[in-house]
Regions:
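Active-site acidic/histidine proton-transfer and metal-coordination neighborhood
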Residues: 50-51, 67-149
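N-terminal pre-domain/capping segments
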Residues: 1-94, 127
Length: 149
């Protein structure tokens, strides 16, 4: 196990993590950041990871509205998740953190079924990429948390 912290994907961030004596970093590429900010720069990020001996331990995207009012995947949101799964794979990052928003007008059971479908698409997409899908334990754009979940 490597200890790390949440930080950015620029050189100053990798240098800072290394100066702390840590060997892992987690990227939070949240809903207000284009996923290509990470996914479009994996060669540069990988070089920084190697230069500073700081592995990318996980990548996550918090706060995204992933399903619409009918419980269907929003194509742009799904594409951001796929971009970041691809980035994780390219960087040797083993975990992608994700949530699923609540759909108003649906029951808890229906919302669970919607989330399972959404997560299932990501799990299927990540097959063969050496990336596991994890659900973050926070309510920011996610109802799958707490005791009931």
């Amino acid at each position: 196990m490597k200890l790390g912290i949440i930080n950015g994907w620029d050189e100053a961030s990798f240098k800072y993590v290394a100066e702390l004596g840590l060997h892992a970093v987690e990227f939070c590429c949240n809903f207000y950041v284009d996923s290509m900010e990470v996914a479009g720069h994996t060669d540069e990020i990988k070089a920084l990871s190697e230069k500073y001996d700081v592995a990318v331990g996980s990548i996550g995207r918090w706060g995204e509205t992933r399903v619409d009012e009918n419980g269907e995947a929003i194509p742009a949101a799904l594409q951001h998740d796929k971009n970041l799964i691809d980035a994780a794979s390219a960087l040797g990052c083993p975990v992608y953190n994700v949530g699923c928003n609540w759909t108003e007008g649906k029951t808890y059971k229906e919302n669970c079924e919607i989330a399972i479908r959404y997560f299932g698409q990501l799990i299927e997409y990540a097959k063969g990429k050496n990336v596991k899908i994890a659900v973050y334990n926070c309510d920011w754009g996610n109802f799958v948390h707490g005791e009931k979940a």
